[in-house]
A protein has these predicted regions:
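Membrane-integrated ABC transporters
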Residues: 1-36, 44-65, 79, 83, ...
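A generic short-segment signal for beta-strand/edge and adjacent turn/coil regions
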Residues: 14-16, 70-71, 95
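Transmembrane-helix bundle segments that line or gate the permeation/cavity pathway
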Residues: 36-39, 87-88
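Hydrophobic alpha-helical segments in the permease module
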Residues: 65-75
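Inner-leaflet juxtamembrane helices
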Residues: 79-95
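Short cytosolic helices in intracellular loops of multi-pass membrane proteins
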Residues: 91-108
């Protein structure tokens, strides 16, 4: 059921925009993991330099850390931004689709005639359900991707 809900968007007329945004989310997430690997290596160099009292390498390592931290922040911010753009586009598409189904072909009128019109605010329910579905689906995907690549990168 969830797969059918997801796949309809990825095969719609917006599929190329959606796939491009998803590729951006994946690339930025992988970039974040790569920056974590670089920071891990930096930690080794930094604390070895401190332990060996190699103070001449202290400031260059601090500069390197600043560069790594800056890049990691850039990756993280853009990953959130691109994910939210994808989320908004997906939510808008799904909400429009289900509102059209609800309001099209006199569906609401037929339910009212049949005496099944006791639902209040169906448009709000559709919007909330779509929001939850898209948010949780993308969150789960990005979380699994980030944790799996971190596991592979650090093991």
């Amino acid at each position: 059921m969830a797969w059918r809900l997801m796949s309809s968007y990825w095969h719609s007329q917006e599929k190329w925009k959606a796939r491009g945004l998803l590729a951006g989310v994946i690339a930025l997430t992988l970039g974040q993991v790569y920056m974590l690997v670089l920071l891990n290596g930096w930690n080794n160099d930094f604390y070895n330099a401190l332990q060996q009292r190699a103070f001449e390498s202290f400031w260059p390592l601090i500069g390197q850390f600043a560069g790594f931290a800056f890049l990691h922040i850039i990756f993280a911010v853009y990953a959130v931004y691109v994910r939210q753009v994808l989320e908004i586009k997906w939510r808008k598409w799904m909400t429009d689709k289900y509102l059209d189904r609800w309001l099209g072909h006199q569906t609401y009128y037929r339910l009212q005639v049949a005496g099944q019109d006791d639902m209040d605010n169906p448009d709000q329910r559709i919007a909330d359900d779509v929001n939850s579905f898209v948010n949780l689906t993308l969150g789960l995907f990005v979380g699994v991707l980030k944790q799996a690549t971190s596991l592979v990168a650090f093991v």
